[in-house]
Amino acid sequence: MGKIIGIDLGTTNSCVAVMDGDKPRVIENAEGERTTPSIIAYTNDNETLVGQPAKRQAVTNPKNTLFAIKRLIGRRFEDQEVQRDVAIMPFEITKADNGDAWVSVKGEKMAPPQISAEVLKKMKKTAEDFLGETVTEAVITVPAYFNDAQRQATKDAGRIAGLEVKRIINEPTAAALAYGLDKGKGNQTIAVYDLGGGTFDLSIIEIDEVGGEKTFEVLATNGDTHLGGEDFDNRVINYLVDEFKKEQGVDLRNDPLAMQRLKEAGEKAKIELSSAQQTDVNLPYITADATGPKHLNIKLTRAKLEALVEDLVARSMEPVKVALSDAGLSVSEINDVILVGGQTRMPLVQQKVAEFFGKEPRRDVNPDEAVAIGAAVQGGVLAGDVKDVLLLDVTPLSLGIETMGGVMTTLIEKNTTIPTKKSQVFSTAEDNQSAVTIHVLQGERKQASANKSLGQFNLEGINPAPRGMPQIEVTFDIDADGIIHVSAKDKGTGKEQKITIKASSGLSDEEIQQMVRDAEANAEADRKFEELVQARNQADHLVHSTRKQLAEVGEKLSAEDKAPIESAVNELETAAKGEDKTEIDAKVQALIQVSEKLLQASQQQAQADAGAQQSQSTKGGEDVVDAEFEEVKDK
């Protein structure tokens, strides 16, 4: 059985780990980094760049460089959070035919799972290069507060990337696994505060050890799937734009190129201010008007940054209070606090968390890598490589159906341990009703329309009867991935209807299969592109070495011998600029054939040079005089 890798598919950065023996190991990517920016770029020559190469060219290609796609995954275009992003993202967010939020690149609509799959493919390749074998299975993490649609979409991304997603696990739970695996015996309750690039989660987790087996049980979870480092960056960017407008009278919001430079500079300034008290944001030639070029140079202090984002940090504390209340615990009952996600490096965040819990958070957990490490541990558990670890996760939101009067009737309460199954009997609302519609909802509001609609289906063929008489049993079944299956059964006729909840929109199986085929076709195109680049490199090398030989020994060849070589060199040089690998290969062979005499002349010259060097060293030896010395002793 192959390895099951663990992938932290992050909003800003992603990370991959695997069990190496009995220890989890984070794998470095091709650039030598342990994390990979979750950035995808589509270039003008139809190349797809992922990670650092995509980030490097973002300034010159803002409309086709996609980032923070996780904020769109499994979301509707009309969602309030999506509309906020539409206003600030340099790329185009568009409405799909099914109402989902998609992205438009070069006139082509793309689904977020399709784009996220590019990052997953990079993670898969990173693991394969390290392991030296093909990887087909993975555990992928999601924010604990992701709803069913977002979990489904993440699974779809895995399928498109050619991975069988063995388990979807929650990020804070994964971090707890990473933290608790090597800790000593004893029971403890920990809080995982996970503030990443685009999402925030707080989970209360109990780690118990019974008979050598460690149980990680999630007691409660809460969060905000649209709060993270990107929002902190946007506050900095807006401040810089407003300051520049005050100084220069120019609004940079209409200039995508300038905004992309500002995004990069804003993120860099925010990171610097975690260790420094002040930084300069210096962007020469940010724009120009009739009076000439304009330069941006603004000082940003840590105090100013904290004032800009204070409400965001305060917003993160609300889910903390709710989770503690749901778990039935007081702050004093929390033994340890773990910080996860790059944004938790900000001193203000650490300070507020310490103030709330009355204790300093742990410093021995790497906030960027803990989630991927935990995912790898779970992969090891599923593969049978890691023993004596049991993970008990929860469903983050309540689940139920719409009943008479537009009310949501809850079947499964939030923070219920999964997998779980629950049934309840309902009846008809009208006399002689022959069908019922089961409308599945997720959320905490009593009003059905205020919750997330997960989908609906009909149960037909109910025998005519007075209202309230038929007995319809509705069963909710949540699997270990947090994916929901719902069935409805008429107890009178035995008729049953069941569905696995597909998001009320989401991708159909046909669309996913098409995207898998597209990804495979892209892999073939990538392979051909790599072969073309290798052929070009070989051609360039041959052109260079042939010209060098012509310069060194060309005078020893006749004009008739020299002309076809020069002609073949020029033809190969032209072919190397084209896209046809077959033609490049043919011209390489042609040059090798006509260069035979040049090669002979070059070898003769090399032999002559070697002979001259040998005779020179012999000649040098003739000047040596042999002499005998005798020891003269001092008298």
Curated annotation (Swiss-Prot):
UniProt KW keywords: ATP-binding, Chaperone, Nucleotide-binding, Phosphoprotein, Stress response
Segments for region (Disordered): 600-635
Modified residues (Phosphothreonine): 199
GO molecular function: ATP binding; ATP-dependent protein folding chaperone; unfolded protein binding
Alphabetized InterPro entries for the sequence: ATPase_NBD, Chaperone_DnaK, Heat_shock_70_CS, HSP70_C_sf, HSP70_peptide-bd_sf, Hsp_70_fam
Transmembrane segments: none
The protein's role, per its UniProt record: Acts as a chaperone.
Protein name: Chaperone protein DnaK
Source organism of the structure: Histophilus somni (strain 2336) (Haemophilus somnus)
